[in-house]
């Protein structure tokens, strides 16, 4: 008999996470590494576990994640978004709780592009009067 996974795609900045959850003991594997090894900062690990802690499912699921693009912060946010979506697919009654905490909404903030004639996105060249 095949094990049934629940799937969720999470995105944040330029990072994309594909999250698969199945009933288990609470193991979280990101790109083949344990979550504590993959995310070197404690904040990244905390962000990833937030939806599970909120819904009190931190030791009920084994989670397998593939994440690409972005940096450490963006990837952590993408994984959180993916876990949230997978939990909702598993049990739709969790949606209002997760929505209230703000985990369901995709954080649409992206890096603003650099403009021609500027040093950065908004930083202009220094003005010289003479």
UniProtKB/Swiss-Prot annotation:
GO terms for molecular function: RNA binding; structural constituent of ribosome. Coiled coil: none annotated. GO terms for biological process: translation. Gene3D superfamilies: 3.30.230.10. This is Small ribosomal subunit protein uS9. GO terms for cellular component: cytosolic small ribosomal subunit. Belongs to the universal ribosomal protein uS9 family. PROSITE patterns: RIBOSOMAL_S9. The gene is rpsI. It comes from Aromatoleum aromaticum (strain DSM 19018 / LMG 30748 / EbN1) (Azoarcus sp. (strain EbN1)). It comes from the Bacteria.
